[in-house]
Amino acid sequence: MVGPTERELAQRWPLIMATCMGIISSSFVLPYYSIGALLTPVTEEFGWSRAQFQAAILFSSGLGALTSPLIGWLNDKYGPRRVALPSLIGLSIGLLTASQIQGDLWMLFLAYGMMALLGAGTIPVTWTRAIATSFFKRRGLALGLALTGTGICASVAPHYTVWLTDQFGWR
């Protein structure tokens, strides 16, 4: 006989998988783990120093830290779906902007700023809220499984980004 604990996991595993994928694609995860593979091709093409390039990441991180409490509040008020979906579009706009950089350093800062601000609703707090409100007996396990998205991205994104860059260029 399957108890309520096992049923909870069996019935809601798609939510765990969706949360894991959401965390992988978040503005706090994917851009940070793929940036190392882009450092050399971008800095060589535009003649920027590593410090200039990495400053855009610092800028984005600062914006992310400032917006996190607001995103938590928005999740409480509107729910994760209404926060995440528009933010995924915003994050995509930021990524598209990054692909159009023509050598102006301010464009890099703009693109990473857009990823941080417009994609702010994709941060893990949004995705994990769905887990926290849907699981009761196995909430910790469900959160742990969902948060493996960060480790998966850290393991896969750099290698995949290098391969994509080799095949198609950094844009």
Predicted feature locations:
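Residue-level signature of mid-helix packing/kink "hotspots" within the transmembrane helices
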Residues: 33, 61-69, 154-155
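Pair of pore-lining "gating" transmembrane helices in MFS-fold secondary transporters
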Residues: 11-34
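Helix-loop-helix hairpin linking two adjacent transmembrane segments in secondary transporters
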Residues: 150-171
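C-terminal ends and interior cores of transmembrane alpha-helices
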Residues: 89-103
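Helix-to-loop junctions at the C-terminal end of transmembrane segments
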Residues: 67-80
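Intracellular juxtamembrane helix-capping segments at the cytosolic ends
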Residues: 42, 119-135
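Hydrophobic core of transmembrane alpha-helices in multi-pass small-molecule transporters
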Residues: 24, 94, 105-122
